[in-house]
């Protein structure tokens, strides 16, 4: 065989090998995305009742995550317990307006700090266009308005804050408050659920009748005192132990609104939780240079309780963290990735931008103002180099904190570029 034929054969073999390697890589990526999506589906299922504190939903999800970290090949998995006080709504959740039944999570939600209520109540509507504070409180003092529920619009709470607070207190004889939500989809929160106020407070959709006369309700709440939950921490040992990388995501969500309505939280934040499990699996199979820690936090939607606890009780000194990645809501289809970066993390962010520009993982990285909106915050406050990655404003984002944040409205599109950006960064940082 001549030299030219040998060279041609060698070239052809190289091409074939490259094609085969590319096909294997594509297959592995497809399997990775499939495994990732399967975990998102599991975590957002009814089994975990919205990963809240009623029905022990969050802790059940935590046990599932612990097992997934173990299956991923982590060298060590531990649970870090902590306690919180939290208001929940696990029982009756019935509300009718002028005899018409409203649907929890769609037509109405509870403020997270609201007590329950039972009975039929007259409605007193506040006219914010022709606002007269003295007249309102004089009207509410009349015998015929005793124990009425006050109805106002969403912006009343901002425009007339002092009066709004007065309506919440026993100083005013109204039985409770109802106010209309401004967006098409009702949201639910847990951030201020560590207390219970004196009167029931209900959010209703913009379709709530402006001329409604009365409401009938049977709503139960349960305040959990010193409820024990836990962070799940997995470790993959590296070649060096003087520094480490940390990957975080919160696995808790909003829980339930009565016995039948739950908040699945596929995008927020089953998506981020599943992602750090796949990252643990990746580094367990590819021994890293530095130790890797993967922390699934509970209590985030209860205002960063789990991450704050960990930051105060770290299992390795915070000074050893080389870089921390917080993944919160990465299950969307926006080609632009939102992020927030701590001051010590800016050098790393510049490298991330460079890698993103070279490889086109995302159209761009849109850096916003650093804020206390997710689990990176307690670390940023303590001088840790960190970044918060969130895929917001895509088609899934409209369902944020609603009962419609389901596996069906979740998109895995942003998962793979996020995974590649992170692993590429760690290889070069």
Predicted segments with their positions:
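Second-shell loop/turn segments in exported
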Residues: 46-56, 81-83, 153-157, 220-222, ...
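Soluble metallo-hydrolase cores and metallopeptidase-like ectodomains found primarily
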Residues: 115-134, 183-264, 281, 285, ...
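His/Asp/Glu-rich mid-to-C-terminal helical/loop segments that flank catalytic regions of hydrolases
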Residues: 281, 396-429
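Metal-dependent peptidase/peptidase-like ectodomains
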Residues: 288, 297-397
């Amino acid at each position: 065989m001549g030299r030219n034929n040998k060279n041609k054969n060698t070239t052809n073999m190289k091409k074939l090998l490259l094609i085969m390697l590319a096909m294997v890589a594509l297959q592995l990526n497809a399997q990775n995305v499939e495994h990732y999506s399967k975990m998102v589906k599991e975590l957002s299922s009814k089994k975990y009742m919205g990963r809240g504190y009623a029905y022990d939903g969050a802790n059940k999800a935590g046990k599932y995550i612990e097992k997934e970290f173990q299956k991923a090949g982590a060298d060590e998995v531990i649970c870090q317990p902590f306690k919180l006080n939290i208001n929940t709504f696990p029982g009756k959740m019935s509300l009718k307006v002028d005899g018409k039944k409203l649907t929890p999570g769609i037509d109405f939600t509870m403020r997270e700090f609201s007590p329950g209520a039972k009975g039929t109540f007259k409605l007193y509507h506040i006219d914010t266009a022709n606002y007269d504070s003295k007249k309102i409180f004089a009207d509410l003092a009349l015998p015929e308005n005793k124990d009425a529920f006050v109805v106002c619009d969403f912006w009343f709470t901002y425009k007339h804050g002092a009066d709004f607070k007065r309506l919440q207190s026993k100083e005013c004889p109204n039985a409770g408050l109802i106010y209309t939500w401004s967006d098409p989809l009702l949201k639910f929160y847990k951030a201020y659920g560590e207390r219970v106020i004196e009167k029931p407070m209900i959010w209703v959709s913009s379709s709530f009748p402006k001329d409604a006369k009365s409401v009938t309700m049977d709503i139960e709440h349960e305040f959990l005192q010193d409820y024990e939950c836990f962070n799940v921490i997995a470790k993959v040992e590296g070649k060096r132990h003087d520094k480490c990388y940390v990957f975080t995501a919160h696995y808790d969500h909003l829980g339930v609104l009565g016995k039948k309505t739950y908040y699945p939280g596929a995008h927020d934040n089953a998506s981020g939780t599943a992602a750090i499990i796949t990252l643990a699996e990746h580094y367990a199979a590819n021994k890293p240079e530095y130790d890797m820690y993967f922390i699934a936090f509970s209590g985030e939607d209860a205002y960063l309780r789990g991450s704050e606890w960990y930051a105060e009780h770290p299992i390795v000194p915070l000074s050893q963290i080389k870089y921390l990645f917080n993944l919160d809501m990465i299950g969307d289809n926006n080609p632009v990735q939102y992020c927030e970066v701590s001051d010590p993390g800016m050098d790393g962010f510049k490298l991330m931008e460079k890698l993103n520009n070279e490889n086109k993982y995302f159209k761009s990285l849109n850096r916003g103002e650093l804020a206390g909106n997710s689990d990176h915050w307690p670390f940023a406050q303590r001088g840790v180099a960190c970044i918060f990655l969130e895929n917001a404003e895509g088609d899934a984002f409209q369902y944020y904190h609603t009962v419609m944040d389901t596996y069906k409205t979740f998109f895995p599109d942003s998962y793979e570029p996020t995974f590649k950006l992170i692993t590429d960064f760690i290889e070069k940082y």
